[in-house]
UniProtKB/Swiss-Prot annotation:
GO terms for cellular component: host cell plasma membrane; membrane; viral envelope; virion membrane. A lipid is attached at C553, C560, C563 (S-palmitoyl cysteine). The gene is HA. It comes from Influenza A virus (strain A/Duck/New Zealand/31/1976 H4N6). Residues 1-16 form the signal peptide. Glycans are attached at N18, N34, N178, N310, N497. Keywords: Clathrin- and caveolin-independent endocytosis of virus by host, Clathrin-mediated endocytosis of virus by host, Disulfide bond, Fusion of virus membrane with host endosomal membrane, Fusion of virus membrane with host membrane, Glycoprotein, Hemagglutinin, Host cell membrane, Host membrane, Host-virus interaction, Lipoprotein, Membrane, Palmitate, Signal, Transmembrane, Transmembrane helix, Viral attachment to host cell, Viral envelope protein, Viral penetration into host cytoplasm, Virion, Virus endocytosis by host, Virus entry into host cell. Disulfide bonds join C26-C480, C64-C291, C76-C88, C109-C151, C295-C319, C487-C491. It is found in: Virion membrane; Host apical cell membrane. Palmitoylated. Major glycoprotein, comprises over 80% of the envelope proteins present in virus particle. The extent of infection into host organism is determined by HA. Influenza viruses bud from the apical surface of polarized epithelial cells (e.g. bronchial epithelial cells) into lumen of lungs and are therefore usually pneumotropic. The reason is that HA is cleaved by tryptase clara which is restricted to lungs. However, HAs of H5 and H7 pantropic avian viruses subtypes can be cleaved by furin and subtilisin-type enzymes, allowing the virus to grow in other organs than lungs. Belongs to the influenza viruses hemagglutinin family. This is Hemagglutinin.
Length: 564
């Protein structure tokens, strides 16, 4: 059996070197055994030679501190950092692009609430820096620097270090306080102040003498007036009283007035606001590492090599857009038509209409030929480069279309009614649905264009060769031409590079074409004549047989008897 196989291989090899038919040249395109399926405008499953995944599905398990500056709040959230709670001293003067709030952050001072918490949190985060400017406040006939056992610093009773707790004087006096601060600077000031709510009337009079107290804070355009809400509450860090913190922004040229007869938690200064800063905040437990990335999510940092991601809808920085799809593939190669097995011992060749060529690795398009000198394959770099020039940069163009700074944070509503929260969620979901649809459509459109461009360049190559050969060759209908004149490898090369001279071979090609067509016609008539001759012979044999039977019956040599 082995000897038979060897013999067949030798015959096939020998045949390629002793080819006696007309030269044949075929146009073809690159193919691979297993391509990649992509979606186009007209088909959900089109196999292409190569494709690139556009949806990022992997992230780093850490946050990258470069090039964006990250500040880790550790046990402090951003509001406690601004108030100056114990344990937040590491945030003094901190500056950030992204403030990292930890889910494990806790309050470490007197129990408090902020009626407009999210707005204050957003202002502080966007400011990008804790730049506190201390000021002198002249409070008369009151005791300052109140402390609490709920707010210990180094095991000593203390308080928020950015605020001043005012209580009655040792002489049991808390006269009306009326203090004005004018903003003569060129930046807006953020003042944070508070109102203490004692748990009992006794506590109220012990601390402030006056019952009820009152705090009013005004600017030229706003006024906030608060009367303490006295009442018993659950103990938190040993305290049933509470503090409500408020904030006021004073623009340049404006002023702020503090008016109180008790219960004021006064500021010790203000925070400088920077309207040009575009910083933000991220709540996550992911640790900060030593990597480099411009995009952060609550799951970790991402690279920006792909235009889309489906890791998290919470994304900060220069990030891929979040989409619902787990995969979107961009075609970066032509339609894939895997090559068929060689047919017969003589390795019949076929062009692009029947299949692609897996051996064509130097280009997308190329030639195969068969002539008296053998067979060969060569890439056509001109058509390949023309297609690549149009297709290259698709990924960059796609990224440019989605390259705007993308900052999407899930809102945290604490004290707004559920209908607003539901509306916000609906808007965010609708935005994501829209982006997901746009992404899928955009990729399908680009894929359709890629395949159309690739097919167009293949057709251009075929037409270029056809115009060169003209009547010197015949289109075989499968992407190949049968050439009607002798065409050695130099001749084949001239067809490939576009220098083929049709006139040189014209007379030879016409003569050979007529001879070949005449042989074909003669062979056709021969078949017809054979069939006619066979039919006449059969007819004559039957006629002779009938004549013999009639003659024999007349002479009595054969008697026919018919019975009914």
């Amino acid at each position: 059996m082995l000897s038979i196989v060897v013999l067949l291989l030798l015959m096939a090899e020998g045949s390629s070197q002793n080819y006696t038919g007309n030269p044949v040249i075929c146009m073809g395109h690159h193919a691979v055994a297993n391509g990649t399926m992509v979606k186009t405008l007209t088909d959900d499953q089109v196999e292409v030679v190569t494709a690139q995944e556009l949806v990022e599905s992997q992230n780093l398990p850490e946050l990258c501190p470069s090039p964006l500056r990250l500040v880790d709040g550790q046990t402090c959230d951003i509001v406690n950092g601004a108030l100056g709670s114990p344990g937040c001293d590491h945030l003094n003067g901190a500056e950030w692009d992204v403030f990292i709030e930890r889910p494990s952050a806790v309050d470490t001072c007197y129990p408090f609430d902020v009626p407009d918490y999210q707005s204050l949190r957003s202002i502080l985060a966007n400011n990008g820096k804790f730049e506190f400017i201390a000021e002198e406040f002249q409070w008369s006939t009151v005791k300052q620097n109140g402390k609490s056992g709920a707010c210990k610093r180094a095991n000593i009773n203390d308080f928020f270090n950015r605020l001043n707790w005012l209580v009655k004087s040792d002489g049991n006096a808390y006269p009306l306080q009326n203090l004005t601060k004018i903003n003569n600077g060129d930046y807006a000031r953020l003042y944070i102040w508070g109102v203490h709510h004692p748990s009992t009337d006794t506590e109220q009079t012990n601390l402030y003498k006056n019952n009820p107290g009152r705090v009013t804070v005004s600017t030229k355009t706003s006024q906030t007036s608060v009367v303490p809400n006295i009442g018993s509450r659950p103990l938190v860090r040993g305290q049933s009283g509470r503090i409500s913190f408020y904030w006021t922004i004073v623009e340049p040229g404006d002023l702020i007035v503090f008016n109180t007869i008790g219960n004021l938690i006064a500021p010790r200064g203000h925070y400088k606001l920077n309207n040009q800063k575009k910083s933000t905040i991220l709540n996550t437990a992911v640790p900060i590492g030593s990597c480099v990335s411009r995009c952060h999510t609550d799951k970790g940092s991402l690279s920006r090599t792909k235009p889309f991601q489906n890791i998290s809808r919470i994304a900060i920085g220069d990030c891929p857009k979040y989409v619902k799809q787990g995969s979107l593939k961009l075609a970066t190669g032509m339609r894939n038509i895997p090559e068929k097995a060689s047919r017969g011992l003589f390795g019949a060749i076929a062009g692009f209409i029947e299949n692609g060529w897996q051996g064509l690795i130097d280009g997308w398009y190329g030639f195969r030929h068969q002539n008296a000198e053998g067979t060969g394959t060569a890439a056509d770099l001109k058509s390949t480069q023309a297609a690549i020039d149009q297709i290259n940069g698709k990924l960059n163009r796609l990224i440019e279309k989605t390259n705007e700074k993308y900052h999407q944070i899930e809102k945290e509503f604490e004290q707004v009614e559920g209908r607003i929260q539901d509306l916000e969620k609906y808007v965010e979901d609708t935005k994501i649905d829209l982006w997901s649809y746009n992404a899928e459509f955009l990729v399908a459109l680009e894929n359709q264009h890629t395949i159309d461009v690739a097919d167009s360049e293949m057709n251009k190559l075929f037409e270029r060769v056809r115009r060169q050969l003209r009547e010197n060759a015949e289109d075989k209908g499968n992407g190949c031409f049968e050439i009607f004149h002798k065409c050695d490898n130099n001749c084949i090369e001239s067809i490939r590079n576009g220098t083929y001279d049709h006139d040189i071979y014209r007379d030879e090609a016409i003569n050979n074409r007529f001879q070949i067509q005449g042989v074909k016609l003669t062979q056709g008539y021969k078949d017809i004549i054979l069939w006619i001759s066979f039919s006449i012979s059969c007819f004559l044999l039957v006629a002779l047989l009938l004549a013999f039977i009639l003659w024999a019956c007349q002479n009595g040599n054969i008697r026919c008897q018919i019975c009914i």
